[in-house]
Amino acid sequence: MTTQPAFIIDVRSPLEFAAGHLKGAINIPPDRIEQAIGAIDGLERTSPILLYCLSGARSAFACQVLAQRGFTQAKNGGAMATLLLNFERA
């Protein structure tokens, strides 16, 4: 198992998230990332953040948004299926 980053963000839709997600992940769809990111307790601009979705496209967009907002440790984890090789499913 890989050591989990401090924050795991699933940027899929709430329906996709409800169907299954990585253990410890929170759900913030890409169209809400700018508004919701500031409401996460303990999150700082230097906090490690792993974002993922179904294919990696939405998480790439969300990573770009966070980088533009000064989050220096936001990483695109890509596709959920790939991450399941190293992380637990909730």
What are these regions (language model features)?
Residues 2-7, 11-48, 57-90:
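Rhodanese-like catalytic fold shared by cysteine-dependent sulfurtransferases
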Residues 52:
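Short, surface-exposed ligand- or partner-binding patches at beta-edge/loop junctions that are enriched
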